[in-house]
């Protein structure tokens, strides 16, 4: 009896693995689950991309508006998305579209921006003229200083805007399509003037109404923040559709810049989210 009991326990211990039939059943179940889950992965990634982008855009706009109410003006030291040559940075994906153009500020534009609190911007640079031996990044450190988060960056790079400052302009068609803004509230026949700056980590919003500037989360390898400028753009109006300068620039909204097809707003991404199957 004792020998039989010991032998029985020995048999149970030896049979710790699965039989061939059990393995086949498990593999069939795993294959079936993979057939269900794998087709959903691209959709899940795009949903994560669209929902994150929409949330970040809305939160950025809230932070800008809160800053304006607290400090009676819009933030300084936003990223100027043109290079020293006056052209749109090559790594600004939306700059490849017809939505954006290089635009030189007029006296009226400068006055409107200054009256709204925007007096200084941070120029960004191409990689070839950027840091040497430092950590240049199209998103996290697109400036000409020699190290990431350099303590002297603002003192060195913060540049007053003037009539010689080239910035990124936004077409009336793009603003109307994405932000629902029509010049003079009637038509797009006479376009208003819109300019755009990037919301980087060094803006005067940091530590006040914003802990860190949001970064675009993309669903493709070409839209990652190590490839393109992954911050969000803030659009301001400086003149109305009749060419009359605004007394102070008006904040229009926040847009995503990581798509070569053009700018997009929160609603655009939410629409994509709900159209996915």
Where are these regions (language model features)?
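N-terminal single-pass transmembrane signal-anchor helix
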Residues: 15-45
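Aliphatic-rich helix starts adjacent to a transmembrane/signal segment
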Residues: 40-61
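Short, surface-exposed interaction loops/tails
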Residues: 127-277
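N-terminal leader/signal peptides at the extreme start of proteins
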Residues: 1-16
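Short, glycine/small-hydrophobic-rich surface segments
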Residues: 70-112
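A generic secondary-structure signal for well-formed alpha-helical elements
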Residues: 40, 64, 68-75
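Intrinsically disordered, low-structural-confidence terminal and linker regions
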Residues: 17-20, 60, 92
């Amino acid at each position: 009896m004792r020998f039989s009991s010991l032998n029985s326990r020995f048999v149970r211990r030896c049979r710790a693995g699965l039989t061939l039939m059990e393995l086949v059943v498990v593999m069939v179940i795993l294959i079936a689950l993979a057939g269900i889950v794998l087709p959903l992965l691209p959709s899940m990634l795009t949903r994560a991309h669209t929902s994150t982008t929409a949330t970040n855009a809305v939160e950025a706009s809230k932070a800008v508006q809160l800053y304006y109410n607290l400090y009676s003006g819009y933030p300084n030291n936003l990223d100027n998305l043109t290079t020293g040559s006056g052209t749109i940075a090559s790594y600004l994906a939306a700059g490849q579209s017809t939505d954006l153009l290089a635009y030189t500020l007029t006296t009226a534009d400068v006055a409107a921006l200054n009256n709204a609190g925007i007096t200084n911007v941070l120029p960004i640079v191409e990689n070839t003229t950027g840091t040497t031996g430092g950590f240049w990044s199209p998103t996290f450190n697109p400036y000409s200083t020699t190290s990431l988060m350099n303590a002297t960056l603002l003192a060195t790079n913060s540049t007053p805007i003037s009539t010689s400052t080239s910035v990124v302009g936004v077409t009336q068609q793009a603003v109307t399509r994405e932000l629902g803004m029509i010049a003079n509230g009637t038509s797009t026949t006479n376009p208003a003037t819109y300019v755009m700056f990037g919301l980087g980590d060094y803006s005067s919003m940091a530590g006040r109404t914003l802990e860190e500037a949001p970064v675009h989360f993309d669903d493709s390898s070409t839209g990652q923040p190590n490839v393109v400028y992954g911050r969000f753009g803030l659009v301001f109006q400086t003149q109305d559709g009749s060419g009359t300068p605004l007394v102070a620039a008006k904040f229009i909204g926040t847009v995503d810049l990581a798509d070569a097809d053009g700018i997009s707003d929160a609603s655009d991404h939410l629409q994509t989210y709900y159209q996915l199957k």
